[in-house]
Amino acid sequence: MFSDNRMHARLAVPRYYTGGSFHLIDGERKYHYIRANDVSIEGVGLDVPSSIERGAQVKVCFTSEGWRADLDGTVMWCSRADRVSGVSQQAYPNYRVGVRLNPGNSQDNALLYLALKDGLEQVRQQA
């Protein structure tokens, strides 16, 4: 059984979250409009179409109406998690990565977490 020993609670992000978009920059590679699985004040779990090396320095960007965050981080882990989609039902490459956000930007990291938390609460209230 999986044991989660994280210091901070993770906020699950719904698959089709429309309150903002995530982007990841890994050197010359840029991944736009990628899925975020979860967010905490210290990290983000993302889906990307190719592997990223553990220890890579990346930038996580989040944009929503009237707000943008550009946060530096380090890839802590990357694992293949192919998905099946579409009529053909063929798997396509997908990698889940865990990014630890730079603790030197703790205020901006917390703002990202709070913005998502507020956005998700608004969606629940409207449902």
Q: Model-predicted segments: where are they?
A:
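N-terminal helix initiation/capping motif
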Residues: 1-41, 113-127
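Short coil/turn motifs at beta-sheet boundaries
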Residues: 10, 29, 39, 53, ...
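Short conserved beta-strand and strand-loop elements enriched in small hydrophobics
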Residues: 18-24, 55-69
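Short, conserved beta-turn/loop elements at beta-strand boundaries and strand-helix junctions
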Residues: 41, 77-84
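Short, surface-exposed secondary-structure edge patches
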Residues: 47-51
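Short beta-strand-centered aromatic/proline hotspots
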Residues: 71-76
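C-terminal output/interaction extensions
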Residues: 83-127
